[in-house]
Amino acid sequence: MADFYQNGIVTTLHNLENRSVEALESELNEFAKKRPLGLILPSLFSELEGKALPATIDHIAKVPYLNEVVIGLDRATKEQYQYALKFFSHLPQQHRVLWNDGPRLQALDEELRKLGLAPKELGKGRNVWYCMGFVLASNRVESVALHDCDILTYDRSLLARLIYPVANPQFNYEFCKGFYARVADGKINGRVSRLLVTPLLRALKHTLGQNDYLEFMDSFRYPLAGEFSFRRDVLNDIRIPSDWGLEIGVLSEMHRNYSHNRLCQSDIADAYDHKHQDLSLNNDQGGLSKMSIDITKALFRKLATQGTVFNTETFRTIKATYFRIALDFIETYHNDAVMNGLKLDIHSEEKAVELFAKNIMKAGTSFLDNPMETPFIPSWNRVVSAKPDVLECLLRAVEEDHKEFLGQ
């Protein structure tokens, strides 16, 4: 049972009564008559062969209020794309699969690259960006949710609670961030959020002083959750990172573009588990190690745009302050786990904190060495300005792929 406490400066919508999914969907059906609703699913082909996504699609097939489902498919051959078309074919909703590795979308990507407007890195950010473009191009929905495809505990109530705040015409929210407790198999998970992001935000407050952005970011209960929902207009202006800083980058864009009362977070699940990344102690180009560097750089970049001046001494102070705060958090999480009959390995927690502390310095050094680094993908408004027919080209490429390969 959740409490009703409002922390920070972003509205929190709680799960106070465990309201039935049928009751939520009944209202969403009515909302969808005036404000059509959609869903974006960024996926790797490998996820089609896993345990999570097939079960997720079975749930989504029962969702009555969706007008469109847009699936972004990465790392797929032609045969795998054809398999994906069949895999998603039992969805009763209007749906399309973006074959991101196919020749038509690759040709469009090359056109944008020549204009300096294509995503620079492969990954979830690029996948999500093209899916957002397709939502704009198809013009079928007014509000859209986005969630990952590796959720092992998926239930369609998650989607209902995620999209409800931007679907209800009596609410004025432009954006909703999902949150949940990362507890599974008798353990507390979510190491990067618990042991990096929250203590780093607190360390930045101590080091740099209070500012609106840090207060905003620290208001989110699970800032790294991959579940969002938006009003359609948001998709035109948002600039998202193509690296592991995606979730932090999206929140930063919401802070830049909208007042706090247009944003909210919603409790979307009692239980949540998905695939876990390796800590990658000896490889800062993979796993949670690379993730921690990219996330930290995303925070530094945002603060720099607000006038914060960084140097090596600043980063050393931030790192030292972070380290002390993070170690204190380990004791807090351990006591919370013990009281709830859960396990928490203090040794592995401290190893993670030590790695993250080192990576704060690596992120700071990279930030100073590459001051012109711009991992952001351009907004769709900018792309349309440079290539006015880009959305029509994107829509045509996806539809032609669908028509050519669906029956083969």
Outline where the language-model segments fall.
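N-proximal low-complexity "stem/linker" segments adjacent to membrane-targeting elements
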Residues: 1-62
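Terminal low-complexity segments of carbohydrate-biosynthetic enzymes
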Residues: 1-17, 92, 278-408
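Active-site donor/metal-binding and catalytic loop motifs
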Residues: 264-285
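Catalytic donor-sugar/metal-binding loop of nucleotide-sugar-dependent glycosyltransferases
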Residues: 242, 252-271
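Active-site-proximal specificity loops/subdomain of glycosyltransferases
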Residues: 17-20, 80-140
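Short beta-strand-to-loop acidic/aromatic patch adjacent to the donor-nucleotide binding site
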Residues: 138-152
